[in-house]
Regions:
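N-terminal transmembrane-helix/juxtamembrane module of multi-pass inner/ER membrane proteins
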Residues: 1-14, 46-73
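Short helix-capping/hinge motifs at transmembrane helix termini and TM-loop junctions
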Residues: 9, 24-26, 53-54, 115-118
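Interfacial segments of alpha-helical transmembrane regions
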Residues: 20-44
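Membrane-water interface at transmembrane helix exits
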Residues: 21, 45-54, 91, 133-141
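Membrane-helix interface segments
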Residues: 27-31, 59, 94-99
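Alpha-helical transmembrane segments in multi-pass membrane proteins
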Residues: 37-42, 46, 50, 125, ...
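Membrane-embedded catalytic cores of phosphoryl/pyrophosphoryl-handling enzymes
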Residues: 63-143
Length: 143
C-alpha cells in the first residue's frame, strides 16, 4: 500500500498523466497544459494551507505510521488535493472520468489507511482539488 501511495507524492502521477497526454495529443496540448498546471496549483496551494493550519499528523495510541511523510503537517492532504484536481481537470480535458476518480479516491484513502492523515485531511484536500478542477472547467467553457 505504501508503494501505491507513493505514486501521489507531490502530485507525480497526475503531472505525468498530463505531460504524457499533452505529448500524445498535439491538438489538445493547450488544454492539457492548463489541466496539468492546475495539478501544480493544487499542490502549491495545499502546501501554503498546511503552513497556515499547521495540523499535526495522527499519532494513534503508539502505533507507527505505515509510511513516511515529507513533513509533520497533515491538513489538507496533498495526495487528495492533487488527485482530485487531476481527476477533475483531466476528465474535462478528455480522459475517462471513472478510472481517474477511482485512482483519486484510492490514493486519498491510502493515506488514512497508512496512518498519515485523518479522514478530515483527505476530505479537505479532495474538496480543494475538486474546487480547482471546477475552476479549470469554467476556463475550458470560456474559450
Amino acid at each position: 500500500m505504501a508503494r501505491f501511495s507513493r505514486l501521489g507524492e507531490h502530485g507525480a502521477v497526475w503531472l505525468a498523466i498530463g505531460l504524457l497526454s499533452g505529448a500524445v495529443d498535439r491538438r489538445g496540448r493547450p488544454t492539457w497544459r492548463r489541466a496539468t498546471a492546475n495539478v501544480a496549483r493544487a499542490y502549491l496551494l495545499n502546501t501554503l494551507l498546511k503552513l497556515v493550519v499547521r495540523r499535526r499528523r495522527p499519532m494513534l495510541a503508539g502505533l507507527p505510521a505505515l509510511a513516511g511523510t515529507p513533513t509533520g503537517l497533515s491538513f489538507p492532504s496533498a495526495h487528495a488535493a492533487t488527485s482530485f484536481a487531476g481527476a477533475c481537470s483531466y476528465s474535462r480535458a478528455g480522459l475517462w472520468a471513472r478510472p481517474l476518480y477511482l485512482l483519486a479516491a484510492s490514493l486519498s484513502a491510502s493515506r488514512v489507511y497508512l496512518g498519515v492523515h485523518y479522514p478530515s485531511d483527505v476530505l479537505g484536500g479532495a474538496l480543494l482539488g475538486a474546487a480547482l478542477g471546477r475552476r479549470v472547467e469554467r476556463c475550458f467553457r470560456a474559450r
